[in-house]
Amino acid sequence: MPGVLQLNHLRKLLDDESEVVRDAVRRELTGMRRELPQFLELLDEPLTPEEEQAVAELLEPARRTEMEEIWMRWRWLEGSTPQLEEATSQISAFLDGWKTQPGDLGLQLDTLARVAFEEGGRMNAHELAEWLFAQRGGITRFRGNTKDYYSPLNSNLFWVIETGLGNPLSLCSIYRFIGQRFGLDVGGCNFPGHFLARVQVDGKEWLVDCFNRGKFM
């Protein structure tokens, strides 16, 4: 594959100290940025941590420019939940690094919703909160990151899904996005020093503390 051959050539120049060479490598990597993860899987030898860091630094300007260009895309979607998911996907992909695309988050959320349906069927808002946040069989899928509450990683939903840790806002977002795939209306509620989800079950409105095991109040 031509792209893989080109990448093999470029990786030999990643540590070149010439600014002219670095600019040329940056342009080539930027041009193939969306295909890079696929090309990496086809390399005979994976990139070393040092090479990955070099690629990240070279792609950083292009990633920032792209973020600025696509940021307002969410405004053209219908509905507050799709808008929020698009904006969150963009932020999370930027935080997650150059290998990640915004569209990857929707795929992970689809997978999570499919697992929830396979295990719990068509759950209501209370049942879904329990599935996501309560301890069941010794397993808690998502819980509050009490040890590192202010870490920026809590705003990266790729990291939150991978680790099961998050802050109130990111955990409520997970609940809202999965709920939307179940046909549930999950809103948000600002609270002094906190953030809660808002749902209706059997005609009654509830506040849900996703950071505290999905407690209904």
PLM regions and their residue ranges:
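A structural boundary/capping signal
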Residues: M1-M217
